[in-house]
């Protein structure tokens, strides 16, 4: 929550803007810390902080801003965009969706499983670019599952005291999101999903163990909604066409991950899918290179940020033309004649 406020603020200031920021109400302690810091560093006429929830956000959206930058869910992104449209305000929307990871079996599967485990469990899966589900070539399915289990134990249970005791493993941000993620698992279990690993929860501590689900199908909510938690459904596939057919049935994701050493497979997946950004043989790096644009497409976001892209996003590219001498434009003043027509023909050819 700190990064998601400060990161765009830096670019807004760099582009010469005065700014109002509203931190998430779901991380109230961070919001308070940000408010204190900003008030110490800036005059309120330069950068102001508004704390609060939906009522405060609703009032802010009534104002005629020059630009609005929002990070959150597609559902709230639609509300922001609708409000901005009343003033024809430009928006940057960093949203989310179901970011898939494709595993074709041509990489070292232990290493691949380790990367996926890290990306899925970072901040307990509560990042907008976390891998939401995995598509694994059917011959590599069991090896990947075994590798994922080993990676979870390696990362969060090296002393064999249990993952719940790990100081490196996070918790779900609040009770409502804990209940939402838990309900996704329960719904999947009721509809036939198998828990390959994990499944333990502690409501009081808002702890959800990293959980790997197999035998999932599209009727399960875990394959319909963005998970935003440490749950990874795994789907096996036979051929590349199966992968793209499934992926293209979803709204375009914020990130697509391709774990492959096969150039033909990689190019096929790139050519036949749409995503905000793509990582090949790595996870979670679509937003860290300042030379690359970061952002979604359609349901996963509007606009691009990162490096110069953020600077331009918070700027108005204003063209200015000044005549230094002469007045050649008089050549095309009316009344029009054949000479002017010939002049236009030459200009068009040029």
Question: Which stretches of residues belong to each language-model region?
Answer:
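Residue-level signal for inorganic ion chemistry
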Residues: 16, 47, 68, 97, ...
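Rossmann-like NAD(P) dinucleotide-binding subdomain of oxidoreductase/dehydrogenase enzymes
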Residues: 1-111, 166, 237
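Conserved C-terminal structural/oligomerization subdomain of aldehyde/semialdehyde dehydrogenase
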Residues: 102, 207-350
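Short glycine-enriched loop/turn motifs at secondary-structure junctions
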Residues: 62, 95-96, 127-129, 165-167, ...
